[in-house]
């Protein structure tokens, strides 16, 4: 894969930044694409641009504001509480988001002569999001290939990793400190370790604590 080109779907969060570092190890040419869909915290786009610049990765921001008109949600509307009720999808779920993001990323990739798409979706800690499932990604890969008569390959390096394993991967890629201090995962728009209270921060912190405990245990052997 080294001599080929990849497009990373990039939000500037822990998962997509880890995937960006992964892609930089796997491919000769890497570009990032970020989608502006009216995020509640505009800082997300700024963080993504800053990280891409620091890593020397060409970065494209695409306007997807239509998505917010179609599917209002807690990530774009301050009047919608961030919550998850039993038996229901979290209020942070955006209908069609990964479907649209990967479809537009594929169009961009084809224009740029790239056939590899990289996304940080994960089924292990996926919070019930249906568009983070492996079966969806595989299905979409086939659909995109048929729709554009092109041989895309969608890579999901985190698909079967817990959050602790995602921290481990970042460490193995030499990106642990970078990911911990420079990424934005928090739903309340706080960089690095975040607010510590929203679902994204709780998941991130729990994974970090689990990984650090495992690492300390291994070092004591």
UniProtKB/Swiss-Prot annotation:
- Which reactions is this enzyme annotated as catalysing? 7-carboxy-7-deazaguanine + NH4(+) + ATP = 7-cyano-7-deazaguanine + ADP + phosphate + H2O + H(+)
Top class in the EC scheme? ligase
Q: Which Pfam families match?
A: QueC
Q: Which GO terms describe its biological process?
A: queuosine biosynthetic process
> What is the cofactor note?
Binds 1 zinc ion per subunit.
Enzyme Commission number(s) from the entry: 6.3.4.20
Binding annotation for ATP: 10-20
Which prosthetic group or cofactor does it need?
Zn(2+)
Which GO terms of the molecular function aspect are on file?
ATP binding; ligase activity, forming carbon-nitrogen bonds; zinc ion binding
Q: Which keywords are on file for this protein?
A: ATP-binding, Ligase, Metal-binding, Nucleotide-binding, Queuosine biosynthesis, Zinc
The source's domain of life comes to Bacteria
The pathway this protein participates in, as annotated, is: Purine metabolism; 7-cyano-7-deazaguanine biosynthesis
Q: In its keyword annotation, does this UniProt entry include Metal-binding? A: yes
Q: Where does Zn(2+) bind?
A: 186, 195, 198, 201
Check the record and name the PANTHER family matching this protein: 7-CYANO-7-DEAZAGUANINE SYNTHASE
The UniProt similarity line reads: Belongs to the QueC family.
Job description of the protein: Catalyzes the ATP-dependent conversion of 7-carboxy-7-deazaguanine (CDG) to 7-cyano-7-deazaguanine (preQ(0)).
HAMAP family from the entry? QueC
Can you say what this protein is called?
A: 7-cyano-7-deazaguanine synthase
Organism taxonomic ancestry: Bacteria, Bacillati, Bacillota, Bacilli, Bacillales
């Amino acid at each position: 894969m080294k001599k080929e080109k990849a497009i990373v779907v990039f939000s500037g969060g822990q998962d997509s930044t880890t995937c960006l570092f992964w892609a930089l190890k796997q491919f000769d040419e890497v570009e990032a694409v970020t989608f502006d869909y009216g995020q509640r915290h505009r800082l997300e786009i700024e963080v993504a641009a800053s990280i891409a610049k620091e890593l020397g990765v060409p970065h494209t921001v695409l306007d997807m504001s239509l998505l917010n008109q179609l599917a209002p949600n807690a990530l774009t509307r301050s009047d919608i509480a961030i919550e998850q009720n039993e038996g229901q999808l979290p209020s942070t779920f955006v209908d069609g988001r990964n479907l649209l993001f990967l479809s537009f990323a594929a169009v961009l990739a084809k224009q740029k002569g790239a056939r590899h798409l990289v996304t940080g979706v994960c089924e292990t800690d996926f919070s019930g999001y249906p568009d983070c499932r492996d079966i969806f990604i595989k299905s979409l890969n086939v659909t995109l290939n048929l729709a554009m008569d092109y041989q895309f390959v969608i890579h999901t390096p985190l698909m079967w990793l817990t959050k602790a394993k995602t921290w481990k991967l970042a460490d193995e890629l030499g990106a642990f400190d970078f990911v911990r201090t420079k990424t934005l995962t928090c739903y309340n728009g706080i960089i690095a370790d975040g607010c510590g209270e929203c679902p994204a921060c709780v998941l991130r912190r729990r994974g970090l604590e689990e990984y650090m405990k495992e690492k300390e245990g291994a070092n004591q052997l």
